[in-house]
Amino acid sequence: ELKLDESLYVNGVYEVSLDGQEYVMTETTTFDDYGMIYLVKLDESGVTLVSTQDGHLREVPADPTEGFEIESKVDVLGTYGGIRTYFIQDDKLTANDTIYEFAGDPSGELPELTVKESVNCRLEGGNTTLKAGDVIIPQAYSPDDGTFYFELPDGTAGNLLVDLSPDGSEGQMTYSGTIGGVDENELFE
C-alpha cells in the first residue's frame, strides 16, 4: 500500500520498463514546494514501494538506462537546488556520484557570491586565499565530504570545504552554515 500522506499533489506518474521489470515512478509535491519521488515495483506478488528520493524529476528519459536527473533541495552558500543522476539498480534509485550539480535559477543562471572576508580555498594551481571583493560562481557540492565547487569569473575552477554537522537522521552529516567555524553570511554576500 502506497500512502502519499505528505503530498499536496501528484506532478506525474510514469511507467518505467527496465530489464523486463515494470516500475511506476510517481513524482509529488509536498509542503513548501518540496518534492518526493516514489518508485513502485509491479510484479506477480503485487505492488511494492521499493525506493523514495527527495526532489523533482528534471525529465523522464526515453531510455531508463540513461538515468533520471533529479533536482533536490541543496542549501549551501545561497544555492537552493542541486541535480544528480539516479539509476534504478537492485530496485532502488541509486546515484553513481555524490556530487550535486547546481541548477541555478529557472533560466539556469548561477548566482555570483562576493567574498566579504578572506576564505581559504583550493584553485587549479594549489591552495590559496580568496580575498574581500573576489567573486565566485557556485558549481557543485558533495555532501559526503563538504566540498563546495566553484569557478572564478575567468573560468578557473576551485573548491573549499564547508563545515558539516550531524543532521539527526541516521547519522548523516549536513552543511552547518559555517566555513572554518565562521558563519557563511560573514564571508559571502
What are these language model-derived features?
Residues 1-4, 36-53, 86-98:
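Surface-exposed loop/turn elements that mediate protein-protein interactions on large endomembrane-trafficking
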Residues 7-15, 52-65, 102-106:
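Repeated scaffold domains used in trafficking and secretory/extracellular systems
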Residues 7-11, 19-27, 33-35:
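Core segments of small alpha/beta cavity-forming domains
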Residues 15-28, 64-72:
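Acidic/hydrophobic-patterned starts of short beta strands in beta-sheet-rich repeat architectures
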Residues 17-19, 41-48, 62-64:
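A short, structured loop/turn motif at beta-sheet edges
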Residues 29-30, 142:
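Residue-level signature of beta-propeller blades and closely related beta-rich strand-turn architectures
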Residues 30-35, 77-81:
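Short, solvent-exposed loop/turn segments at conserved positions within beta-propeller repeat blades
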Residues 60-189:
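Acidic, small-residue rich beta-repeat scaffolds with periodic aromatic anchors
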